[in-house]
């Protein structure tokens, strides 16, 4: 009887877990212009690129930070 209770418990838990909906990942909205619009103009872009492991960066005419390889 005890084996049956344990088996039913695990069967119900497996059914519960498999029936629950999978949560969708939230999309991350990245704003690339933030480093070129803030105080410091291109300096913040360079620091951002250096922190990501690049050799530097610059802001283009659309105020988007571009990192050098």
UniProtKB/Swiss-Prot annotation:
Signal peptide segment: 1-19
Coiled coil: none
Record GO biological process: defense response to Gram-positive bacterium; humoral immune response
Gene Ontology CC annotations of this record: extracellular space
Expression by tissue: Expressed by the venom gland.
InterPro entries to which the protein is assigned, alphabetical: Defensin_invertebrate/fungal, Scorpion_toxin-like_sf
Propeptide: 20-33
CDD domains on file: DEFL_defensin-like
Chief place where the protein resides: secreted
A GO molecular function held by the record: potassium channel regulator activity
The entry's keywords: Disulfide bond, Ion channel impairing toxin, Neurotoxin, Potassium channel impairing toxin, Secreted, Signal, Toxin, Voltage-gated potassium channel impairing toxin
Disulfide bonds: 36-59, 45-65, 49-67
Compartments (UniProt record): Secreted
Annotated family: Belongs to the asilidin-12 family.
Other noteworthy facts: Is abundant in venom, since it accounts for 45.2% of precursor counts. The recombinant peptide contains an extra Gly residue at N-terminal position.
Record text about domains: Has the structural arrangement of an alpha-helix connected to antiparallel beta-sheets by disulfide bonds (CS-alpha/beta).
Cited function: The recombinant peptide moderately increases Kv11.1/KCNH2/ERG1 currents and shifts the voltage-dependence of the channel activation to hyperpolarised potentials. In vivo, induces neurotoxic effects when injected into insects (tested on L.cuprina and A.domesticus).
Protein name in UniProt: U-Asilidin(12)-Dg3b
Organism expressing this protein natively: Dolopus genitalis (Giant Australian assassin fly)
């Amino acid at each position: 009887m005890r084996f049956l209770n344990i088996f039913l418990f695990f069967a119900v838990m497996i059914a519960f877990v498999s029936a629950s909906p999978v949560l969708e990942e939230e999309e991350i909205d990245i704003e690339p212009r933030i480093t070129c619009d803030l105080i410091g103009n291109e300096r913040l872009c360079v620091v951002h690129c250096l922190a990501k492991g690049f050799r530097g960066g610059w802001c283009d005419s659309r105020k988007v930070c571009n990192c050098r390889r």
